[in-house]
Amino acid sequence: MKIFQIQCSSFKESRWQKSKCDNCLKFHIDINNNSKTSNTDTDFDANTNINSNINSNINSNININNSGNNNKNSNNIEITENIDNKAKIINKHIKTITNSKPIPIPIPTPTPISIKEKEKEKEKEKEKEKEKEKEKEKEMKSTINLRSEDTTSNKSTIVFTECLEYKGHQWRPNICVTCFSPKNKHKNVLPETSTPLISQSSQTSTITPSSSSTSTSTSSISTHKTANNKTVITYISSTTTTTTTSSSSSSPPSSSIAGITNPTSRSSSPILKSVPPSAYSNVVIPINNINNSNSNSSSGGGNNNNKSISTPSSPIISRPITNKINNNNNNNQPQLHYNQPQSSSVSTTSSPIIRPVLRRQFQSFPSNPKISKAILEQCNIINNNSNSNNSNNKDPVILCKYTIESQPKSNISVLKPTLVEFINQPDSKDDESSVKSPPLPVESQPIFNSKQSATMDGITTHKSVSITISTSTSPSSTTTTTSTTTSIIAEEPSSPILPTASPSSSSSSIITTATASTIPMSPSLPSIPFHEFETMESSTTTTLLSENNGGGGGSSCNDNSRRNSLNILPLRLKSFSFSAPQSDSMIEQPEDDPFFDFEDLSDDDDSNDNDDEELKEINGEKIIQQNDLTPTTTITSTTTILQSPTLEKTLSTTTTTTIPSPSTNSRSICNTLMDSTDSINNTNTNTNTNTNTNTNTNTNTNTNTNTNANINNKVSTTTTTTTTKRRSLKMDQFKEKEDEWDQGVDLTSFLKRKPTLQRDFSYCNNKVMEISSVKEEAKRLHGGTGYIHQFAFEAFKDILEAKQTQINRAFCSQKIDAPDCEMLINEINTAKKLLEDLLELNSNSSGSGNNSNDNSGSSSPSSSKTNTLNQQSICIKSEI
């Protein structure tokens, strides 16, 4: 079947396919009206057909163009040549005549396939699939029948639909491992009451228990002081006996089942044999040997055969355990008696069904800690009048008994952690002469015996034993742990049993026990016994107190010494400033004083002296020249204490002494007249100011005034204490780092504006501003006073040198360019020239001033020396 193509008026090359028209999306007809390619052909076929006809088409196109003038009524052919660089394909396009019509393309009629044939083919495919499934089911049934004949006699019809056998996942037991489908969709899952697929009838075992026991004993002692300066001794001894019973297997011929474990219980391994819990339900433990250490302790006619036992429930055991007391004194070791169900041997014919074990059922990691409280069970108060050597120390001794639940050491990984909490503390305000016992708990009331008491030197000791029995079972062994705890707390005065220091000083005593173990005691009460040591044999309380009474020469140590050694002492900085009496020569040359502009630090001018002389001549003897009465000596002591890097305390003391001039001695008349007007000649003022600039301001001022009838001197002392919060000095431009820019502004404000500033312009601009500020300050000083002091000139010069070093560093680190560096150095040089010019003006003015002063009879060198002597240097020293 041949498909005709439609001709279009103009050919437009497609972007993606060079041989296709973009208007009609088809391959066009050549000059000979032969179709090059069909619409179904690929671009490769079209290109090959076009390439084969290139030469013939070019020749025919040339002939048509030459004869185009003669045949005007014929078809006008427009040839467009598009040459591709890679394929070099030339596509010819024919322009149709305007009166011509497009050639219609006949639509082919496809030969339809009958629907019935398609349905038949589908049915055949389905039948083939069903046959394959049936073959697979037959194979699966054959394998299952073979297994069922070999393993079990009770055959059950099992049909498998998905996998051969169901295997539960370890973490998700309801999902099969092989097909990952739920358990409900499997038909091969056996019920729980039926026998397993793989039986172990041939492997039978009989458990014969074999026991082994270990015992450990620990004791601890601790003391603390109450509010009434009473010493409380806590003595806790713990004896732990662990009995482990393991099973050895044998294979008797009989296959009787005495006990079968619960199939619903999950086990981690199918090989281990499980033991019914009824076999270990009753545990009998003798108590006589456990309490042998306590039999010799009571000396007051007590009955030692009556022992008390308390069995609090263990948090590990889920089944109840019945405890019995065996008073047989012939048994030296703990014994275990088992109640055998129906037969003497316990055997299992098959292992339980393999079940996955969930993570939450493992006990390898301990759960949340369980708080076992130390319950106060008995408390007795004994008078201490017989042993008291001092009349002041007659405090009673309080004996308290606590019961603490202890955990065995063998199953630390299985048992829960235990925290001890002291409750029901004895009241220190009880009457000294009476003996009080608080109400006992319901569980521990039958534990105590009133006859278990002994008196020695006015002290009564009480003993009781608390036994905790815990049992943990496993498929192969059973561990029974018996923990015996004896706890005694005795409160006694600090003297004469325990030598302690005075109540005002905090000290810790040392107690020496029978095992030569030295324990430093802490004055504070801990929540858990903090000093714990193991002993060869548990010593009794009576022996402990007697040894402490006789040889308790304890030493004391000061806790504050170690604490103070760790503290960092504050840094003290002291500065002193001294001002000598001023002479008349200083007034003649005020230009040498750098603080001439300040009125409070300068004396009167010569014009004022002339006015005083005129007033003296007018008023006679009633007016005294002011310069003769104002020579003063001022000593300023400033102490700065840096208590912390952010806290600063300043203590300032100023002492001012006013001494009359010697010229006033010749004017005794004037002095006698002024005595009536002067009421206070000696004044001492102490001002203490505490200021905290952080949040609040507290000011405390204390002023002390003393009046003495002293005519010749006036002394005033002022002390000021100021506590301020230390801040930065904001002088970052003088301590520039190599990796940071020196912007010459406040660091905080610069960091806020840093992203918006340009790199080079900001640096150069700030440096120019700093140099110009030095120029302006120098001009201001010279314009106001007419001179610049030499110290100010040196300070300005040092600042300019520092700026020059900073600019050199910036140039070396490539922060600024060479022209910028030259520009900044030129600015510094202009500032230096300005300072030198101002200094020359100062020298000229000082030379003219010296000439005038020489004519008046005064010497400038002497005045300069007195000026340097009057302004003393500042001494700074640190004290730690």
Swiss-Prot record:
Signal sequence, renumbered to the chain: none
Name the UniProt record assigns to this protein: Uncharacterized protein DDB_G0281025
Region (Disordered) location: 101-149, 191-224, 240-273, 294-350, 425-446, 470-508, 536-561, 580-613, 682-713, 844-880
Compositionally biased spans, kind Basic and acidic residues: 115-149
Keyword Coiled coil on entry: yes
Biased composition (Acidic residues): 589-613
Compositional bias segments (type: Low complexity): 193-223, 240-256, 294-332, 536-548, 844-864
Protein's UniProt keywords contain Nucleotide-binding: no
UniProt biased composition (Polar residues): 257-271, 333-342, 865-880
Key words of the record: Coiled coil
Stretches of the chain forming a coiled coil according to its record: 113-147
